Regions:
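N-terminal prepro-regions of secreted/extracellular proteins
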Residues: 1-116
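Mature secreted bioactive peptide module from preproproteins
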Residues: 89-209
Length: 209
């Protein structure tokens, strides 16, 4: 009887562990061909930020299928619409003293988003921190890249390299992002942000290879 109780206890513990582990790892071994609307919905439910789940739930069945197809197919992923926005903000209130001759510290941010059927799947932001004096950009302090959103379970994004420079009175910061789809290389996306002394900003995104 003791052996039977031990075996039953071991089985019960194993079953409980499976219930705890599966929801968080269901997409980790997911192959592109196996990704479905149902499994993707479960993936979104496991995310800490529920905004993507809410947006996805509002889509029609056809739109959901289009999103999932886009996530599975690398060729469709490259065709996703990219929306961008750029902003410049002062790092401190002292930066608002535009009439002074002291150097001012500013940050330009440029965000690129990939969408499928109106649903945002990835969002990458590049920040360039720089100094200005009067109407001139004097130097770049640093460049940073942040994956602010990635709800494609088949895609991993990492920073491959970075570069910063000053040209034509603009501060530039560039990040090369390495994309992988289902653990296979899917090319490099180069994202550049720039800022000026007057507060103008912008950027660009291009596929390197």
């Amino acid at each position: 009887m003791a052996k039977k109780r031990t075996f039953f206890s071991f089985f019960l513990i194993s079953a409980l562990l499976c219930l705890l582990v599966v929801p968080n790892s269901v997409m980790a071994s997911e192959k592109p061909a196996h990704l479905t609307v149902a499994s993707y919905t479960q993936f979104l439910k496991a995310q800490s930020d529920k905004s993507s789940l809410y947006e996805f739930s509002k889509l029609s069945r056809q739109q959901k299928q289009k999103v999932v197809q886009s996530l599975k197919d690398p060729s469709l992923l490259k065709m996703d619409i990219e929306e961008t926005s750029g902003t410049v903000e002062a790092a401190s209130t002292a930066a608002y003293g535009a009439r002074t001759a002291s150097p001012l510290f500013k940050t330009a941010a440029y965000t690129a988003s990939c969408k499928a059927a109106g649903f945002t799947t990835t969002k990458l932001t590049v920040y360039v921190d720089y100094y200005t004096k009067n109407s001139s950009v004097t130097s770049v302090k640093s460049v940073r890249g942040v994956v602010t959103k990635n709800v494609n379970p088949l895609v991993s994004i990492s920073k491959k390299s970075s570069k910063s420079w000053v040209q034509n009175n603009r501060a530039y910061g560039r990040i090369d992002w390495q994309w992988k789809i289902a653990a296979k290389n899917a090319g490099i996306k180069r994202q550049t942000a720039y800022g000026t002394a007057s507060g103008a900003s912008g950027g660009s995104t291009a596929t390197v290879n």
